[in-house]
């Protein structure tokens, strides 16, 4: 949700909390821009799983929710997998493998990079790349909702997917 607010340059579009796990349902945002390839599209905020402080019963419902959502969307242009810069979890690896198994090659965005020291950044990006078994040419986008770092690269990735759709 923080990333969506940052990406769209809006403070309170998506609800954000200090405690991870605020997003507990599929939230749909209709976006309009002046870009001819991205004139109107939807951004979907799905529940995260990593550090969410929610009951196990709630967390157990997220897998089927994500699965049914992602499997039922033929018009889906781009999947963005957010990975916390502090650690790549087993769930991150499983999600990446599952996305590949259903035909999606997600853009991986490493969040909270503003918390990393300069010497940790390169190592963290390499670890994410290796931990998720990413192909050599696939980039990892470092992102900070606080500073806006990575915003232009992520917009570029979304636009690239829209341009390919239009060809």
Predicted regions mapped to residue ranges:
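Residue-level signal for inorganic ion chemistry
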Residues: 29, 111, 154
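Long, positively charged low-complexity segments
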Residues: 57-59
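Extended hydrophobic secondary-structure segments that form protein cores and membrane-embedded regions
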Residues: 43-45, 80-81, 141-144
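Hydrophobic aliphatic residues
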Residues: 7-11, 70, 132, 158
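Conserved nucleotide-binding/hydrolysis micro-motifs of P-loop NTPases
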Residues: 22, 48-50, 85-88, 113-117, ...
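Canonical P-loop GTPase G-domain recognition
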Residues: 115-167
């Amino acid at each position: 949700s923080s990333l969506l607010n940052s990406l769209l340059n809006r403070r309170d579009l998506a609800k954000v909390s200090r405690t991870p796990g605020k997003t507990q349902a599929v939230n749909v945002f209709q976006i309009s821009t002046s870009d001819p390839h991205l004139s109107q599209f939807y951004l979907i905020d799905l529940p995260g799983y990593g550090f969410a402080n929610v009951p196990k019963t709630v967390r157990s419902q997220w897998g089927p929710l994500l699965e049914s959502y992602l499997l039922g969307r033929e018009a889906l242009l781009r999947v963005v997998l957010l990975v916390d810069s502090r650690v790549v979890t087993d769930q991150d690896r499983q999600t990446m493998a599952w996305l590949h198994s259903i035909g999606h090659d997600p853009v991986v965005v490493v969040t909270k990079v503003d918390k990393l020291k300069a010497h940790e950044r390169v190592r963290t990006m390499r670890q994410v790349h290796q931990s998720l078994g990413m192909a050599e040419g696939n980039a990892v986008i470092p992102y900070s909702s606080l500073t806006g770092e990575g915003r232009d690269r992520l917009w570029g990735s979304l636009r690239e997917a829209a341009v390919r759709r239009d060809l």
